[in-house]
Every structure is written in structure tokens, then in C-alpha cells.
Amino acid sequence: MAKVINNRNRKPRKKVCILSAKGIEHVDYKDVELLQRFINNNNKIASRRVTGASARMQRRIANAIKRARFVGLLPYVKE
């Protein structure tokens, strides 16, 4: 009989933050390409579990996205 691997006890691999891997400390609200990586299909800000960002970086990302939306660089809702 084949051995069944139990995935319930397996610890999920920790995601690596894209910004920390590239050495980016400051998230600029004008960098729309970078900010779009942290937005899902419905233009909502993706959670830390999805992005793998630290708490500090997630706050910086969220503030930059909100600023970009206010200025008009990113849409609030999906068209």
C-alpha cells in the first residue's frame, strides 16, 4: 500500500516580500507598476498573507496605494 502524505501537519512556506528582496525601503505612490502587484482583480489591496510583506511594508504599500488613488493614478473600482 502506498504511503499517504499528510499535508495538514506540513508548515506552509513563508512568502518572501518582493520589496525586501529587491532592497526597496521607500514605496513611491507614483510607481504604478509596483503598486499594481499589490492589488487584486477587484482593485482591492491584497492582504499580507497574499503578498508576503511585513507589517511595516504592508502599511507603507497601503498608504501609497491610497495616495495614488486620491491623485488619480490608480482607480478605486474595477471598470
Swiss-Prot record:
Keywords: Ribonucleoprotein, Ribosomal protein, RNA-binding, rRNA-binding. One of its GO terms (molecular function) is small ribosomal subunit rRNA binding. The keyword Transmembrane helix does not apply. The keyword Ribonucleoprotein applies. GO terms for cellular component: cytosolic small ribosomal subunit. GO terms for biological process: translation. InterPro entries: Ribosomal_bS18, Ribosomal_bS18_sf. It comes from the Bacteria. Coiled coil: none annotated. Disulfide bonds: none annotated. HAMAP family: Ribosomal_bS18 (MF_00270). Part of the 30S ribosomal subunit. Forms a tight heterodimer with protein bS6. Binds as a heterodimer with protein bS6 to the central domain of the 16S rRNA, where it helps stabilize the platform of the 30S subunit. Belongs to the bacterial ribosomal protein bS18 family. This is Small ribosomal subunit protein bS18. The lineage of its organism: Bacteria, Bacillati, Mycoplasmatota, Mycoplasmoidales, Mycoplasmoidaceae. The gene is rpsR.
